[in-house]
Amino acid sequence: MTQLAVPSPAAPTLPDLVEIQRESFLWFLREGFEEELLSFSPIVDYTGKLELHFLPEYRPGDPSKGYKINKPRYDPEEAKRRDATYQAQIRVPTRLINKETGEIKDMDVFIGELPLMTDRGTFIINGAERVIVNQIVRSPGVYYKSELDKNGRRTYSASLIPNRGAWLKFETDKNGLVWVRIDKTRKLSAAVLLKALGLSDSEIYDSLRHPEFFQKTMEKEGHYSEEEALMELYRKLRPGEPPTVSGGQQLLESRFFDPKRYDLGRVGRYKLNKKLNLNVAENVRVLTVTDILAVIDYLINLEYDIGHVDDIDHLGNRRVRSVGELLQNQVRVGLNRLERIIRERMTVSESENLTPASLVNPKPLVAAIKEFFGSSQLSQFMDQTNPLAELTHKRRLSALGPGGLSRERAGFAVRDIHPSHYGRICPIETPEGPNAGLIGSLATHARVNQYGFIESPYYRVENGVVRKDLGMVYLTADEEDEYRVAPGDVPVDAEGRITADLVPVRYRQEFTTAHPSEVHYVQVSPVQLISVATSLIPFLEHDDANRALMGANMQRQAVPLLKPDRPYVGTGLEAQAARDSGMVVVSRTSGVVTYVSADEIVVRPDDGGDPIVYRLQKYQRSNQDTCLNQRPLVYAGDRVVPGQVLADGPATEGGELALGQNVLVAYMPWEGYNYEDAILISERLVYDDVFTSVHIEKYEIEARQTKLGPEEITREIPNVGEDALRNLDENGIVRIGAWVEAGDILVGKVTPKGESDQPPEERLLRAIFGEKARDVRDNSLRVPNGERGRVVDVRIFTREQGDELPPGANMVVRVYIALKRKIQVGDKIAGRHGNKGIISRILPIEDMPYLADGTPVDVVLNPLGVPSRMNVGQVYECLLGWAAEHLGVRFKLMPFDEMHGLEASRLTVEAKLREAREKTGKDWIFNPEGKYCGKIQVFDGRTGEPFDQPVTVGRAYMLKLVHLVDDKIHARSTGPYSLVTQQPLGGKAQQGGQRFGEMEVWALEAFGAAYILQELLTVKSDDMVGRNEALNAIVKGKPIPRPGTPESFKVLVRELQSLCLDVSVHKVEVDSDGQTRDVEVDLMADVSSRHTPSRPTYESVTSEDLSPAAGGTFTLARRSREEDEDREEEDDF
């Protein structure tokens, strides 16, 4: 049973949370693509006799005359399985007109393939789900800025920024002159530009409100005629070329008045008209003379304190580019390339034989779209750890990417929270680290309007009464500045009258107070200003913002558990977050369930149509190796309504988000095991699979065509015993259901090897006996170090089955291995309030502290983690969860509950605890009096004695995060070295070593551990000769020789020499007569004038030594050094 703890005003259900992705892509299909095609139509050849028109009979709103999309070859599921892209072919009606003969050819032409969006707002590219992140960029338009020069005089500048094309910047200087820069080039007088545009003095003066200011500029530079001004313009922009009037004219035309080269965009025109009070038509996307005069007029007015300068971080000046627009820009790039190709073909080919199909080559457009989806910074591998991660990824706003900022150049101002973010961009959810503030998340109720500006909804307030009956009004940041807006948690009575005497309001970006009668608008919900992830944190208002940020980010890293468990204390948004994430199955119609199995649900609709079959995902692997599994919630015969959840997905229970588990926590220190945020847990969490999750890993191998012949997937692997092959079938592929450990063969593969690959002894044997040993080497796919599990699926791809394989591959085999991971020491768990920690010890149940009724606690947290971090929300949650458990209910609390009275959270929790105590009759549950209010007596499990002080105990919601110790633990004995520095590589994937850095070296220096330090910097790292000899010495039990010169020192010497610095190394020798002289040492020559570094030589036992003829005694034969050097194997030590 779920109970709303506080009778909150029914929060309006949130809008569709993935709308931003879907709407944008639909706009691209409906308008964006056609808009681009029409902007390139017609394409005329250089002589002007051939014309190619796209969409010749296009009429807005009539789809029959537009382009056509064919049915995709695969559906999304099939595309994923085949590693294909979910895309459709596009055909465009074209018309080729031959002006000489008057001949007209109409044809539908294939122009390329477009990846389609799935109904969850994602794209499937080469079998992987990807998301296009929304980009937030500076809006085109005009921006005014003021600066103080070094003499303290204020100067103003205006930048005219188009969507694409040249920037135009006007500036005033200390002498009161107006200058202009075109594309950041040299300064040019504004008078010259205006004269070059063909304006007379009187026209210029008439259009300015303060012509006297411009007079100085005209007197100094305004004596040019139009021709002279054009010559002067050409001289400034193209210095070094002979100026001509026509050249200047053409330069000006192409820079600002040619729609191909200059485009303000719809937004730019809208912003320009709004800022300068113009009424130029919206379809005029290039600059006009009126625009330029108005910009100069506004600039001059600023000198007279009329108008105001702009704040570039205000959300009225930043807009969102979603999928549709990013894709449209990419299509433009492709069509630009296509246009060049078409023109060339028109010129080269015979005009009689030309058809539109022979002119249009789909390759450039396909390449541009592929490049965007495959390698753009904004096309990201979807974060599928859990439903919330997926949802947040689709709502992310990034200031990075093409046309945006870069991490290095972004200052503090851009990253900072701006008052206009309120209700539009979440002030809390952003990454920690270099991207802080550059990547944000859309607020819960925000939406993006047709121009790309973020809007937030409000209710009107008239004479202090909230008019919900009038519906919601969406305002952009610009519009909102003019009104007094109250937050969503102002107290109102039943009639909607605001009851407070003074209300906090936002007005012109200031946070002030106002009388209810002065308020214009009120927000629709208290969670309007935060994002979805943040709004899932209960008692958010009691947490410090830094910790709330960690809490929001860590919920996205929670691993879906085996047995999902909804939180006892939630915020009421869990159901919608789960539904909109696309991981649960939602009914499309009302009807009756006729059939339910683990794999599918069949619903018979009420309108009598065909039964609808909902297929469920079973144990699929997600992008993050977690397990996607859907479980039915309905039974045959149940009635369902549209929007009802039919099946749970990963990390959901009963259609609500369930990222973690409700566990019994006690806040107390325990033998130092929870020092520094470490966490002590009970063995019960392991045995009862409370924090157990399923992970599915994918391993892949391809059999390629090599120069020496094809690689073969087979069971016949050289030098491998039958025991290692026990799990393989007759083709050498592991069977489904086999349990495999690290090093086991998954797929047997042999590669042909040439003459050079064979060691000398094998060559010798073949020379003597002439026998043809199988010249193949083992190249099988094995389970990597530290991995294990059960094989759950094997997929084989071959060309014969019609699969598309990478070039050079004959066959691809993919093996999926699943593993149940129980919680263990080293795993990271966290609450929703930024309280995270690593498990330090798992105690037996009998040793855990226990309560008065004998219940052992599950988790022991350190109480010192609360005061300094200021995330007190966790204490409220833990105590309310304690009450919820005893009352048998779940609570839903909207954050920001002060509208229900002062200290509403504390009073609510206290009231519920009292209720639980009275209802259950257990007095020890809650101690209402004195300084121990809310704490209870806890007993030591080892001794049975009560602890000295009462302890805070309750039910908290804890998440297991994806940072699992199994994926991180790593050790290296011998492994690969870097080619240049010869130092060990780093990282688990490269089988790397641990970096002994600068500071660690200082620590050993300070301690005086000279020999350990020398070993670390030479033998254990990059002294090639030394490390081989050390290995030999260890194998033979001899003393380790002295270290030599590190390779990185030689690299340093070589780099200095490459800068023409004569650097060499000398050593001092003492002659027999006591004289000293220094001798140059050649570091590059090898110790014993050998060219190759020595390899380790082992004492090895040969088969002859073991033969009975030798008397069965062991003699040790040693392979010679020369033989060693002949082995051209990779130096893997």
Curated annotation (Swiss-Prot):
The keyword Cytoplasm does not apply. Its EC number is 2.7.7.6. GO terms for molecular function: DNA binding; DNA-directed RNA polymerase activity; ribonucleoside binding. GO terms for biological process: DNA-templated transcription. Keywords: DNA-directed RNA polymerase, Nucleotidyltransferase, Transcription, Transferase. DNA-dependent RNA polymerase catalyzes the transcription of DNA into RNA using the four ribonucleoside triphosphates as substrates. In cyanobacteria the RNAP catalytic core is composed of 2 alpha, 1 beta, 1 beta', 1 gamma and 1 omega subunit. When a sigma factor is associated with the core the holoenzyme is formed, which can initiate transcription. This is DNA-directed RNA polymerase subunit beta.
